């Protein structure tokens, strides 16, 4: 009887180890967007809207209307530090990251002020990455509108 119980425990343990390993492989397989496809200097060359009218959003990133980001330059380093510079001369330091949620890659950033550390900032902004091929980057910011959701779509080109 002890041999049967021991065999069952051993079989269950082996099954748990195999299942745990295969799950981690599936998670990493969906996370194929590396920092290399996002690092560099980017220019916002167009802003479009999906599911919402163009004038539905008055302010994005607590900075101004989406149109102020047209032509802006985003510099993203591999360390996660970065800046964006608007065409009106405004420059904002940020800390950015990539993560995959339910198989969908997301770009997140926190705005940094003088000598402020990203770990001390609780709020930030998250956009879905719908394209990142190393030369073009498309970020979709979700927006609640009326009884549904829409998106502000930022199309960036690498400089």
What is the predicted function of each stretch?
Residues 1-33:
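Bacterial Sec-dependent N-terminal signal peptides
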Residues 21-95, 99-159:
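Lipid interaction determinants
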